[in-house]
């Protein structure tokens, strides 16, 4: 309430209890994430460029890890965080699946991929980095390495060339 410069009384005028407030907040964050991904996909980048653009955008959205809603949720409401994480995994799985299919269609990713396992590998890497890394800078570096690892594992020669182009761009 302090950070938003409104009183708790005002907040509870609109939300009958803290659980409902938290649930509504989570839904709002999920909606924002979904809309952000949709906007990036609508720009029609190639699959690899799309991955880097999503990475860049989310870095900006959550650049202050300690003030991010996800960090606060994990710290103060671990049960609600676990539920929110499960929902977020579903959103990410669809995003990853669509991106892999797009990359295959563009000839940037190999055709004979075990898509389900590649999705599981990548989100396991990303979520574990964020769960187990204390430093935001270290997490950022590991996320870029995980993205590189993920793309290299799937890429054709054309995909590797596109990947190298983005890795050599310092604005990841």
Question: Which sequence ranges carry the predicted segments?
Answer:
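Helix-turn-helix
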Residues: 1-20, 24
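C-terminal peripheral helix-coil segments that are non-catalytic and often amphipathic
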Residues: 98, 102, 106, 135-172
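Helix-loop "lid/cap" segments that line or gate small-molecule binding pockets
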Residues: 56-61, 70-73, 148-154
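Short secondary-structure transition hinges
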Residues: 63-108
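Hydrophobic alpha-helical connector segments
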Residues: 24, 35-65, 119-122
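Generic hydrophobic, amphipathic alpha-helix propensity
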Residues: 1, 25-29, 33, 96
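Gram-positive cell-envelope targeting signals
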Residues: 8, 13, 69, 95-96, ...
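Hydrophobic alpha-helical bundle segments that form small-molecule/ligand-binding pockets
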Residues: 91-120, 125, 129, 133
């Amino acid at each position: 309430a302090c950070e938003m410069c409104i009183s708790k009384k005002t907040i509870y005028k609109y939300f009958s209890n803290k659980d409902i407030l938290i649930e509504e907040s989570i839904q709002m964050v999920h909606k924002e994430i979904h809309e952000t991904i949709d906007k990036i996909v609508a720009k029609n980048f190639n699959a690899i460029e799309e991955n880097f653009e999503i990475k860049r955008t989310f870095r900006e959205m959550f650049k202050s890890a300690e003030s991010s809603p996800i960090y606060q949720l994990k710290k103060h409401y671990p049960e609600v965080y676990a539920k929110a994480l499960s929902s977020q995994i579903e959103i990410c799985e669809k995003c990853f699946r669509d991106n892999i299919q797009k990359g295959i269609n563009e000839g940037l990713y190999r055709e004979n991929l075990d898509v389900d396992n590649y999705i599981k590998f990548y989100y396991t890497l990303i979520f574990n980095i964020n769960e187990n890394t204390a430093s935001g800078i270290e997490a950022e570096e590991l996320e870029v390495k995980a993205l590189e690892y993920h793309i290299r594992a799937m890429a054709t020669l054309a995909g590797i060339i596109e990947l190298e182009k983005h890795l050599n761009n310092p604005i990841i």
